Amino acid sequence: MEVLKWVVTIVVLLFVAIFAFGFLSGDPSRNPGRGSGQ
């Protein structure tokens, strides 16, 4: 069942990457007053 494990790992990594990318890209848009990044 290595294929299933690989598929799950890839899906999780893609989901985390998309979530992180969307969060970083939408962080200043969501919190224009705070600006915790910079």
From Swiss-Prot:
Which Pfam families does the entry link to? PsbI (PF02532)
Instruction: Provide the coiled-coil residue spans.
Output: none
Q: Which UniProt keywords apply?
A: Cell inner membrane, Cell membrane, Membrane, Photosynthesis, Photosystem II, Reaction center, Transmembrane, Transmembrane helix
Topology class, membrane: Single-pass membrane protein
Q: Name one GO cellular component term.
A: plasma membrane
- Where found? Cell inner membrane
Q: What's the domain of life for this entry?
A: Bacteria
* Transmembrane feature ranges: 6-26
Does 4Fe-4S count among this protein's keywords?
A: no
Q: Which GO terms describe its biological process?
A: photosynthesis
State whether keyword Metal-binding applies.
no
Its annotated function is as follows: One of the components of the core complex of photosystem II (PSII), required for its stability and/or assembly. PSII is a light-driven water:plastoquinone oxidoreductase that uses light energy to abstract electrons from H(2)O, generating O(2) and a proton gradient subsequently used for ATP formation. It consists of a core antenna complex that captures photons, and an electron transfer chain that converts photonic excitation into a charge separation.
Q: How does it assemble?
A: PSII is composed of 1 copy each of membrane proteins PsbA, PsbB, PsbC, PsbD, PsbE, PsbF, PsbH, PsbI, PsbJ, PsbK, PsbL, PsbM, PsbT, PsbX, Psb30/Ycf12, peripheral proteins PsbO, CyanoQ (PsbQ), PsbU, PsbV and a large number of cofactors. It forms dimeric complexes.
Tell me its family. Belongs to the PsbI family.
Q: What is the name attached to this protein's record?
A: Photosystem II reaction center protein I
Gene name, per UniProt, is psbI
